[in-house]
A protein has these predicted regions:
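Bacterial N-terminal signal peptides
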Residues: 16-27
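Glycine-rich nucleophile elbow surrounding the catalytic serine of serine-hydrolase chemistry
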Residues: 189-199
């Protein structure tokens, strides 16, 4: 658990009085004045309905199973807490977990994809670390893939309203339950959750003291457009279709050609900008397949000549979504943009449809570089992206960071905003080599939960003590045992092997500017 820090105001004086009395009596854990968990059922907060408020006492383990993207519907908790569920306004379902042993911090957690579920995995992670933690379905349930059709209000909830309302009302419930407000608020999310974090930074800078946003992209329509275009090209020329084995062979060929450029042959392209990979060199592809692959893996361009989304990094293992299931990329245009159930993806046009989507659903293009309101509050932002992310182009996050630097200058930007490119990592977590630094979608406990190894601990240290992170030590584990470590460097630095010692030890690596880093 992180150490308690003092906050100002009358609530702080009350807290100090209680702690002082407990110290005199020999008690070891602060006790907060609070109402009972069941009393929260009667909480009177405008536009908030509390449906359940139950005490959870693991004996010794409490398990919850649910269906959600990437296993985020499952949870295991070993600490006692008050589990609150309810609805904000009409459709924004949320849960707030309030630990008995509270560290006076609030953690809002994001979702993934187009949301529609409660992120129980990250709730469990937060409450186990002493945070009062909240998650929302963002105003709809993913059991209905057509949730946006006929409901433009749900799109607004999904984009930004639900995140903001969850933060505002969770803070009210926390203060009511504990008799004291959280002294700091943090947000952590990846993919769709990263988009939510960036919308909080850009639209509601006061909501969170620190935001950790992974693989946020900058354009949800840009992400969906790549998948839609893949299907359109296959419809237009079935002979050009690429199967999963073809995409895998393309990624493997890129790695074979560029792996050793960084001096270490380990299956990782540390500096994709230095890799001059030609898809045509992939064995076994027909000319039609080569052109198809170039259109999908390269910059997403329209007929107007404009690039609407960057290329994927060489080595990223691309895969498409099925045409049925919880999330269907084409619905980003048919349902979201045009509110047309009969929209046919055969008519898809990159320039027209991506532009229309970003205009109709502006919150899914998170490109506002005016972060001064967030900076002036002394709030902090950490973003990260996998070097081999097959969903969100690594370059998209780099381009956004560079755009903020162009606007504010490097010293001012670095005073509150850091980007980390995780070599070898895919989408949000996993991949090749050491990629675990405590990020969501992983929530493993094999790494130390300190600021050197854990992104959330580092954010707390930056916000509350002013010590900014310049690198993390990431780990790779097998059967719960760490088998390799390596630094993750603040952009534009990249990991560099010294040439001596064990390549699997971070002690033999440093963060270095390699000259031709992605810009």
């Amino acid at each position: 658990m992180f150490p308690l820090t003092r906050c100002s105001g009358s609530g702080n004086r009350r807290f100090i009085t209680v702690v002082f009395a407990l110290l005199l009596s020999g008690a070891s854990t602060p006790v907060f004045a609070k109402i009972s968990c069941a009393d929260l059922l009667h909480a009177q907060i405008p536009d908030v309905r509390i449906d359940t408020a139950e005490e959870i006492h693991p004996a010794p383990l409490w398990k919850f199973s649910g269906n959600a993207l990437g296993g985020l519907g499952a949870a295991e908790v070993r600490v006692p807490f008050c589990r609150v569920s309810g609805v904000i306004e009409q459709e924004i379902a949320f849960e707030l977990w309030l630990p008995d042993d509270w560290d006076q911090r609030y953690l809002g957690v994001g979702n993934g994809g187009d949301a529609g579920f409660i992120n129980y995995s990250s709730l469990a992670y937060g409450v186990s670390r002493g945070f009062a933690s909240a998650s929302s379905n963002l105003g709809h349930w993913r059991s209905d893939p057509h949730w946006a059709l006929g409901h433009p209000d749900r799109l607004e909830n999904f984009e930004w309203r639900a995140h903001h309302l969850m933060a505002v009302n969770s803070k009210k419930l926390i203060a009511l339950y504990y008799g004291s407000p959280a002294h700091h608020a943090y947000y952590e999310g990846c993919s769709g959750g990263g988009m939510g974090g960036m919308n909080e930074v850009q639209r509601f800078p006061a909501d969170y003291d620190g935001v950790i946003a992974g693989a946020s992209g900058t354009s949800f329509p840009g992400i969906a457009a790549r998948w839609v275009l893949d299907k359109v090209l296959t419809q237009q020329d079935p002979a050009s279709e690429l199967k999963p084995d073809d995409w895998k062979r393309i990624a493997e060929t890129a790695i074979q050609q560029c792996d050793a450029l960084d001096g270490v042959k380990d299956g990782i392209i540390i500096n994709p900008a230095a890799c001059k990979f030609d898809i045509a060199s992939t064995p076994g592809l027909t000319p039609a397949q080569v052109q198809h692959a170039k259109a999908i893996l390269g910059p997403l361009a329209g007929r107007d000549g404009r690039t609407y989304f960057p290329a994927l990094s060489p080595g990223a293992l691309y895969s498409n979504f099925p045409e049925q299931g919880a999330f269907i990329p084409a619905l980003s245009f048919g349902d979201w943009t045009y509110q047309d159930p009969n929209w046919n993806l055969a008519n898809f046009d990159v320039a027209r449809d991506v532009s229309a989507a970003e205009a109709v659903v502006p919150g899914v293009r998170i490109w506002d570089t005016d972060l001064v309101p967030f900076e002036r509050l002394n709030h902090k932002l950490i973003t990260y992206i996998g070097g081999e992310d097959p969903t969100v182009p690594t370059q998209a996050n780099i381009d956004y960071y560079n755009a903020v630097v162009d606007r504010l200058g490097k010293p001012e930007t670095d005073s509150f905003f850091r980007l980390f490119v995780v070599s070898g990592m895919g989408h949000c977590a996993g991949g090749t080599g050491p990629t675990d630094f405590g990020q969501p979608y992983l929530n493993e406990e094999s790494h130390p939960q300190d600021a050197e190894h854990d992104v959330l601990a580092a954010m707390i240290l930056w916000v509350e003590e002013g010590r900014a992170p310049s690198q993390f030590i990431a780990s790779q584990s097998e059967a719960g045992k760490v088998i390799a470590t390596r630094p993750i460097c603040a952009y534009p630095m990249l990991p560099h092997f010294s040439g001596n010692g064990d390549v699997n030890s971070a002690a033999n690596w440093s963060c270095t500017y390699l000259g031709e880093a992605q810009k």
